[in-house]
A protein has these predicted regions:
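Substrate-binding rim/cap in mid-to-C-terminal beta-strand-loop elements of soluble/periplasmic
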Residues: 1-39, 43-58, 147
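Non-transmembrane alpha-helical segments in soluble domains
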Residues: 2, 25-29, 33, 46-49, ...
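A structural signal for well-ordered alpha-helical segments within the folded catalytic domains
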Residues: 19-26, 40-43, 82, 131-134, ...
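Short, solvent-exposed turn/loop segments enriched in Gly/Ser/Thr/Pro and often Arg
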Residues: 41, 65-67, 173-177
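Cytochrome P450 catalytic domain signature, combining two hallmark sequence patches
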Residues: 56-57, 107, 156-160
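WW-domain-binding short linear motifs
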Residues: 59-64
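C-terminal, low-complexity/hydrophilic appendages and adjacent surface loops
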Residues: 67-151
Length: 177
């Protein structure tokens, strides 16, 4: 994330705190002097602008990608990220069978359905297998995420911790797999 705000952020400064797109709206409201509604997720990034460490900042984050099979053909997955590790769970039906899992792709008139129909008309979809697959990366030793260490000797403890964290995020955010 790159932000230019000359009166409040020093040029070429860096912040390594974990931020997400859900933090944008709370930040804009904060900069405008408005309170964030209680129902709105995310946290204002303004405390990070000073460059000093922020004591009460998130220690992990959750993300969910669910637009398969349209757009990029990236399989459905969700995951958690901590300062050191990222655990990713790829799941779901493959190919056109995945449409039954995506409530928008099967609903006529939605952009997802329009995209799906356009891609189907040019035989864009393959008959991908159904999957249930995990990846784990040590971001400290493998920042480019090239070496999946899930299931490798010595990773069982962190896998268990991150799976519990992922389950808690899913429960608290009411995420259906």
């Amino acid at each position: 994330l790159i932000i230019s705000y000359p009166k409040h952020i020093q040029p070429k400064s860096e912040c390594n705190q974990m931020v997400q797109n859900i933090d944008f709206a709370p930040t804009f409201l904060d900069l405008a002097g408005l309170d964030k509604p209680k129902y709105m997720p995310g946290t204002s990034l303004q405390p990070l602008f000073a460059g000093a460490p922020v004591k009460k900042w998130r220690k992990s984050l959750y993300y969910h990608y669910y637009d398969y099979p349209t757009y990029h053909l990236v399989r459905k997955h969700d995951g958690v990220r901590t300062e050191r590790y990222k655990l990713i769970h790829f799941y779901g039906k493959g190919g056109e069978r995945a449409v039954v899992e995506n409530k928008y792709q099967g609903q006529p008139g939605t952009r997802e359905n329009n995209c799906f129909n356009a891609l189907k008309s040019i035989n864009y979809f393959t008959d991908d297998a159904d999957i249930d697959y995990w990846e784990l990366y040590d971001i400290k030793s493998d920042p480019n995420e090239l070496h999946n260490i899930y299931g490798k000797p010595g990773t069982q403890k962190i896998e268990k911790e991150l799976k519990k964290l992922l389950a808690n995020y899913r429960k608290n955010l009411k995420v259906d797999e």
